[in-house]
Amino acid sequence: DYTLANGTLTINAGATSGTITIAGIVDDSLDEANETVVITLSSPSNATLGTDSVHTYTITDNDNAPVVEFNTTSSSGAESVSSKDITVDLSAATAQDVTVNYAVTGTATGSGTDYTLANGTLTISAGATSGTITIAGIVDDSITEGSESVILTLTSPSNATVSYTHLRAHETNS
């Protein structure tokens, strides 16, 4: 993200200051936390160290956080499929883990009656561009009933913003 090697600063006779240059600061497109460069003065000759011998320079990230959203806004399947993976995408990779909460609602009954999935938090690891929420244990019962829905709602992201917040998954009787 920058170039700065250990070295020696020479302040010429008669001068009262010198300059250390942090070169090559990279303006990348990767969303990341601010970064710091710490410069420490040590071992002076013909001078003594003052009280301010350490300088911290902060490289402020100027990239937007990625957008987190469902890969699609709806899907469907027969109750005989046993599980359904729902993909959540990031608009770009990031150097930070992204978390997003999801709430589960709809006309299907959770807790193992029609499916198994509780409210939760999805984590998409740094460098990845998608994650998966799995509606598990979809029950293939013999009860005659209409199509049922599971609605997932994304909320409270960290290190990202939310775009499409809802996904409706339909379960049809087989």
Identify the role of each PLM range.
Residues 166, 173-174:
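Single conserved hydrophobic/aromatic residue that forms the stacking wall/gate
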Residues 1-168:
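Short boundary segments that mark the start of a structured unit
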